[in-house]
């Protein structure tokens, strides 16, 4: 631990009115003090205010007027899925700042660096490699803490991601566009290797950050358990599968928690157009946000039970189904 940097950062944060939420508070927002809670709930969920860090969890009410005891979720009806099993979908859209749960991973990866003094706000830049939402989360967290940051993502990602980033970064040069689309993770790594030559760049790489794994195992896992227990009620319903896309394997870590506590199996989803785990294959696809073409260091592969290939044609058709009058 670098105590002098920790003390300097603490003074800097005090001057900016920054209070960092604990992992325990994000796992259970009932632990957040009433004073902080009352302040947070008066803010716009996307405001560049450090108090919004206390919304970086699964328990935000849909209108963001309160915190919940159970995460927002939906149960897909059998008429839609064609199967009898209840399929519970936990909703990440109610996270603050970026309307996606990747902001949680970004905070979980940055927090230890702040606490141990390895990140010096006066000279370091946080570099956020991503296929889209993780770098948005990292830029958002950095911005409200007063830290410098760089976003790296493929040039072929959605325009909405780039529009958002341009509003949040200090300088448009802090958005680095690499070649390719969703599957081109190697090109992101190549850019990181170049940036890492400057020792003031701290590469916070979600694909090999064990804090990404630990954050989701602790927070997302227990949050999803509450969703299941709510749906189960007083019935004999059993949790059979936890299903998550491969991506950085952060969200997959919740499966390890659920397997340990609910005895679930873990199913890993990847695009059939880029069947890395299924066939050691590669290719291009348009399921934005799940990455591909490599197995992340933090993926607990031997604890995964099934790999599920999904075509981007299927996901594109679902977008049409739910977003057109004909659908």
How would you label these PLM feature ranges?
Residues 71-88, 104, 112-115, 194-198, ...:
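Acidic-glycine-rich active-site phosphate/pyrophosphate-binding loop
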Residues 103-125, 135, 220-234:
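Short internal alpha-helix immediately C-terminal to a glycine-rich phosphate-binding loop
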Residues 2-122:
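Positively charged, low-complexity intrinsically disordered leader regions
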Residues 117-156, 235-253:
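A short, small-residue-rich loop immediately preceding and capping a beta-strand
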Residues 186-200, 259-327:
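Active-site/ligand-binding loops adjacent to catalytic centers
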Residues 195-249, 253-254, 258, 316-327:
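Active-site/ligand-binding-proximal alpha/beta "capping" segment
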Residues 124-125, 136-193, 276-289, 295:
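Active-site-proximal loop->helix
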């Amino acid at each position: 631990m670098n105590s002098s940097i920790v003390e300097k950062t603490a003074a800097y944060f005090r001057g900016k009115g920054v209070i960092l939420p604990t992992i325990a508070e994000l796992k259970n927002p009932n632990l957040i003090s009433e004073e902080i809670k009352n302040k947070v709930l008066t803010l716009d969920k996307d405001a560049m205010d450090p108090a919004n860090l206390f919304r970086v969890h699964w328990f935000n009410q849909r209108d963001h007027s309160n915190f919940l005891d159970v995460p927002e979720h939906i149960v897909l009806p059998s008429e839609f899925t064609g199967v009898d099993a209840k399929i519970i979908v936990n909703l990440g859209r109610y996270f603050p700042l970026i309307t996606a749960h990747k902001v949680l991973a970004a905070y979980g990866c940055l927090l230890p660096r702040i606490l141990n003094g390895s990140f010096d706000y006066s000279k370091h830049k946080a570099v956020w490699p991503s296929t889209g939402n993780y770098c948005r989360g990292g830029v958002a967290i950095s911005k409200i803490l007063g830290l410098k940051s760089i976003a790296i993502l493929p040039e072929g990602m959605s325009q909405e991601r780039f529009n958002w980033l341009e509003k949040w970064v200090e300088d448009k040069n802090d958005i680095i566009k690499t070649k390719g689309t969703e599957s081109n993770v190697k090109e992101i790594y190549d850019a990181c290797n170049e940036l890492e030559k400057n020792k003031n760049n701290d590469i916070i790489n979600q694909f090999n950050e064990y804090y990404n794994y630990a954050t989701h195992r602790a927070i997302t896992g227990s949050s999803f358990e509450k969703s299941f227990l709510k749906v189960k009620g007083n019935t004999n319903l059993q949790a059979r599968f936890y299903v998550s896309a491969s991506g950085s394997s952060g969200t997959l870590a919740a499966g390890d928690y659920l397997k340990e506590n609910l005895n679930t199996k873990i199913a890993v989803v990847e695009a059939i157009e880029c069947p890395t785990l299924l066939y050691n294959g590669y290719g291009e696809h348009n399921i934005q946000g799940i990455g591909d073409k490599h197995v992340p260091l933090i993926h607990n592969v031997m604890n995964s039970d099934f790999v599920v290939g999904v075509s981007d044609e299927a996901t594109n058709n679902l977008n049409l189904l739910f977003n057109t009058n004909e659908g």
